[in-house]
């Protein structure tokens, strides 16, 4: 994924974020099972973020939106959806109870997305996000 920036040229000045298209392949090549991944909060967090990212990347093939990430120093947003007309939606993925969403607030101040959503943890359930057609979120 490319880094989101309002200026087109700046999007391609940053190092892209690696995103798998299929988390089954990620799990297979890491040689760990689902239950083993869940036992390590750090690894589980990366796995959940990868699952959400794969879900979104696969939808970019069907829907009219572009997918990015955003980072500015220590502030980060896991996924930024840009729809037609530069409508933005910011998504932050949480796999545990740690709810530091400061990156969402900084991003909102800079870019004014129409919507922001925290997925997982004590927020919007991960399973519900993955089982809901992405069009529902894009039409909010």
Model-derived segments and spans:
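Accessory nucleic acid-recognition modules appended to NTPase machines
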Residues: 1-83
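Active-site ExK catalytic segment of metal-dependent nucleases
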Residues: 87-97
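Hydrophobic/aromatic beta-strand patches that form the interior of the parallel beta-sheet core
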Residues: 19, 68, 89-91, 115-119
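Catalytic cores of nucleic-acid endonucleases
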Residues: 95-138
């Amino acid at each position: 994924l490319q880094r989101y920036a309002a200026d087109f040229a700046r999007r391609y000045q940053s190092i892209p974020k690696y995103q798998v298209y299929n988390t089954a392949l990620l799990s297979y090549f890491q040689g760990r099972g689902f239950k083993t991944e869940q036992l390590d909060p750090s690894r589980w967090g990366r796995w959940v973020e990868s699952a959400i990212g794969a879900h979104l990347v696969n939808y970019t093939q069907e829907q009219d939106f572009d997918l990015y990430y955003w980072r500015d120093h220590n502030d980060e947003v896991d996924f930024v959806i840009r729809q037609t007309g530069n409508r933005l939606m910011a998504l932050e993925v949480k796999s545990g109870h740690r709810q530091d969403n400061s990156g969402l607030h900084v991003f909102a101040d800079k870019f004014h997305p129409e919507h922001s959503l925290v997925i997982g943890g004590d927020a919007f359930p991960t399973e519900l996000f993955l089982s809901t057609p992405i069009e529902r979120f894009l039409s909010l």
